């Protein structure tokens, strides 16, 4: 896919994600209207400059809680989904009022993971974004919490925003949060935590021994770990990603103009293809294949297909063309791919030579378990 909208070198596609902690007052859970108004002004100004802008907004559950007088985020799924339905309408009304004042049209786009799992629906979502951006509209995106089920949830809007940025092949992804940048530890509990301004590769984080923590705020779901995971998805698509303070939306324009505010993640110089990004991040893996060292080396170092001889163990139940994770013996994921055999058949041929497949299974199947065209390193 190529997101060509007669763009010039001076205009960009920009995805901005704002979390519940930035949208609401921490003490009451009520909307932080001044922050939202400044965000609307900033995004409208970016649009007026010819940029294509997408806003991924959390807050439906938090706003619903405030509207209903609930003092804490509900844990029961049915109640949370009901509260999200209340909050989403209120949230969109606020956005629509603010953007209308600025004469900027917006659109509500609610997504579930299943919208990205099926390739035809994935492409349909892409086409919808393409048309909205061509019309000069700012799509306001959220997970459809009211209907999403656990098995097909994004889990947090950091992941959703990265998948949207990957889908539309954005130039920038801004993850607005309640801290000003990434630190070597949580600065709220470790006063001497070291700020990190630039990450040239995700592997750098291990070298820096970043202790990001997974906990989110009281009202949100995304901690710093989810933002790093989101950055991994985005930079693989060639999207420059920035973590910065959500209370100061005007910093978005300053960053685009070259100021080094927040933490910047440099994009990969050679982005993964759109189809392989769909395999790696759009699909939900339903099984795991544990590989021997020879197969791992062939895949990682030589870009080879996976053969049955390299599979040591099969976990999960799946059918041909389902997505699976490829793991080392310790369970660390190294790749994902679309498998050519069901889990039942693969159990029978794992560890065997490809030429033995017809004798074992009674039919002539593919020589590969996963062809390299359907395999992507993660």
Swiss-Prot record:
MF GO annotations: ATP binding; glutamate 5-kinase activity; RNA binding
Listed name of the protein: Glutamate 5-kinase
Main localisation: cytoplasm
Residues of the PUA domain: 286-364
Compartments, record wording: Cytoplasm
GO CC field: cytosol
InterPro entries in the record: AceGlu_kinase-like_sf, Asp/Glu/Uridylate_kinase, G5K_ProB, Glu/AcGlu_kinase, Glu_5kinase, Glu_5kinase/COase_Synthase, Glutamate_5-kinase_CS, PUA
Role: Catalyzes the transfer of a phosphate group to glutamate to form L-glutamate 5-phosphate.
GO biological-process terms attached to the record: L-proline biosynthetic process
EC number: 2.7.2.11
Chemical reaction(s) catalysed: L-glutamate + ATP = L-glutamyl 5-phosphate + ADP
Record key words, sorted: Amino-acid biosynthesis, ATP-binding, Cytoplasm, Kinase, Nucleotide-binding, Proline biosynthesis, Transferase
Residues holding substrate: 58, 145, 157
Binding-site positions, ATP: 17, 177-178, 221-227
Family affiliation: Belongs to the glutamate 5-kinase family.
């Amino acid at each position: 896919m190529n997101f060509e909208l007669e763009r010039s070198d001076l205009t960009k596609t920009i995805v901005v994600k704002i979390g519940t902690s930035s949208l609401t007052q921490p003490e009451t859970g009520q909307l932080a209207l001044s922050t939202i108004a400044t965000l609307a002004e900033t995004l409208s100004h970016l649009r007026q400059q010819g940029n294509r802008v997408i806003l991924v907004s959390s807050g439906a559950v938090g706003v619903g809680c405030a509207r209903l007088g609930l003092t804490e985020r509900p844990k029961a799924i049915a109640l949370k989904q009901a509260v999200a339905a209340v909050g989403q309408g209120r949230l969109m009304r606020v956005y629509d009022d603010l953007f209308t004042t600025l004469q900027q049209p917006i659109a509500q786009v609610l997504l579930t993971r299943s919208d990205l799992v099926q390739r035809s629906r994935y492409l349909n979502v892409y086409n919808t974004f393409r048309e909205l951006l061509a019309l000069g509209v700012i799509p306001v995106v959220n997970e459809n919490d009211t209907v999403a089920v656990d098995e097909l949830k994004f889990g947090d809007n950091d992941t959703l925003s990265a998948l949207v940025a990957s889908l539309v092949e954005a130039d920038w992804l801004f993850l607005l949060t309640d801290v000003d940048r990434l630190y070597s530890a949580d600065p709220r509990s470790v006063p001497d935590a070291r700020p990190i301004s630039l990450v040239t590769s995700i592997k750098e984080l291990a070298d820096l021994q970043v202790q990001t923590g997974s906990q989110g705020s009281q009202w949100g779901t995304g901690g710093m770990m989810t933002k790093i995971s989101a950055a991994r998805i985005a930079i693989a698509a060639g999207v420059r990603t920035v973590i910065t303070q959500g209370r100061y939306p005007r910093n978005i324009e300053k960053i685009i103009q070259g100021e080094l505010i927040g933490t910047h993640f440099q994009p990969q110089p050679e982005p993964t293809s759109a189809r392989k990004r769909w395999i790696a991040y759009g699909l939900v893996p339903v099984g795991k294949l544990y590989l021997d060292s020879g197969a791992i080396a062939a895949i990682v170092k030589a870009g080879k297909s996976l053969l049955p001889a390299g599979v040591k163990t099969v976990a999960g139940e799946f059918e041909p063309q389902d997505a699976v994770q490829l793991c080392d013996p310790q369970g660390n994921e190294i790749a994902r791919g679309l498998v050519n055999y069901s889990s039942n058949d693969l159990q029978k041929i794992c560890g065997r030579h490809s030429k033995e497949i017809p004798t074992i299974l009674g039919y002539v199947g593919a020589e590969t378990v996963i062809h390299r065209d359907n395999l992507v390193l993660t």
